[in-house]
Regions:
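Alpha/beta-hydrolase fold active-site loops
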Residues: 66, 94, 162, 181-182
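Sec-dependent bacterial lipoprotein signal peptides
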Residues: 1-7
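A domain-start/cap signature at the N-terminus of enzymes
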Residues: 9-67, 112, 145, 153, ...
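C-terminal catalytic histidine-bearing segment of alpha/beta-hydrolase fold enzymes
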Residues: 184-186, 192-239
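Serine-hydrolase catalytic machinery in alpha/beta-hydrolase-like enzymes
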Residues: 34-58, 62-132
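Primarily recognizes the serine-hydrolase "nucleophile elbow" in alpha/beta-hydrolase
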Residues: 81, 128-130, 136-180
């Protein structure tokens, strides 16, 4: 496992196969199931905590839509994951899918990839079976631990994800990096939960040195996702 700022978090190498390697199986394909109507829906992904799916009012089956997977922070749930971009989804025409971690936070935070990868896979499979997807705008993002997990899964699956959005991440702990997704990182200079000097200010130059196209923005606040940064990230994703 390639580690960027992960040593201090106790990340260990994962197994070579399936979810333990952080690899996703789902791929965009022909629609085979009836899509949900516009609005917010719970989706069963095989765990005790459902995912949340938001279908924008502007969705048209004959026009492929951008899709963004959104991951919550520690102690959160699917609603916390989807909320930062929810207000902008209709105008942007983006489908949002937000799974929940199996435990209080995402598995790689505890040392290795595991069942949470399968939860993301099942959430994506649900979307791919029901909606026409724009494969040039397929993103994964998150806040705090969710941002770290989005970076970790996104870089491990850069042949699937075109964009990764990380709001106040702590680290990236990808498996074997595949592809070169574009990356957006924002972080508050007054963050006391994941101090910026120990996280994003170290992480973003290392990602650039590894060859990634990184947009990096700091803002005058703490461990939050300001609405203007959420909108900025979505505009970047859609251009």
């Amino acid at each position: 496992m390639v580690l960027l700022l992960a040593a201090a978090c106790g990340i260990e190498p994962s197994g070579p196969d399936g979810a333990t390697a952080g690899r996703l199986v789902s791929q965009p394909r022909a629609v085979t199931a009836t899509p949900e109507s516009p609005g917010l829906h719970e989706v069963d992904v095989g765990s005790s905590r459902p995912a949340l799916l938001y279908v924008p009012s502007t969705y048209r089956p004959d026009a492929p839509s951008p899709v963004m997977v959104l991951l919550h922070g520690a102690g959160g749930d699917a609603r916390g994951g989807i909320d930062p971009l929810l207000a902008f989804a209709d105008e942007a025409g983006v489908i949002l899918i937000a799974p929940s971690s199996r435990r209080t936070t995402w598995d790689v935070i505890g040392g290795r990839f595991g069942p949470d990868v399968m939860g993301i896979d099942r959430a994506l499979e649900h979307v791919f079976a029901r909606f026409s997807v724009d494969e040039t705008r397929l993103g994964i993002g998150g806040f705090s631990d969710g941002a770290s997990y989005a970076l970790s899964v996104g870089l491990t699956n850069g042949d699937l994800f075109t964009h990764v959005v990380a709001f106040s991440p702590g680290f990236s702990a990808e498996g074997e990096a595949v592809g070169r997704p574009r990356i957006f990182i924002s972080h508050g200079v007054d963050d006391r939960v994941l101090p910026i000097d120990r996280t994003s200010r170290r992480l973003q130059p290392r990602l650039r040195d590894a060859g990634y196209d990184v947009v990096y923005e700091e803002f005058a606040d703490g461990h939050v996702v300001p609405a203007d940064k959420a909108r900025r990230a979505l505009d970047w994703f859609l251009r």
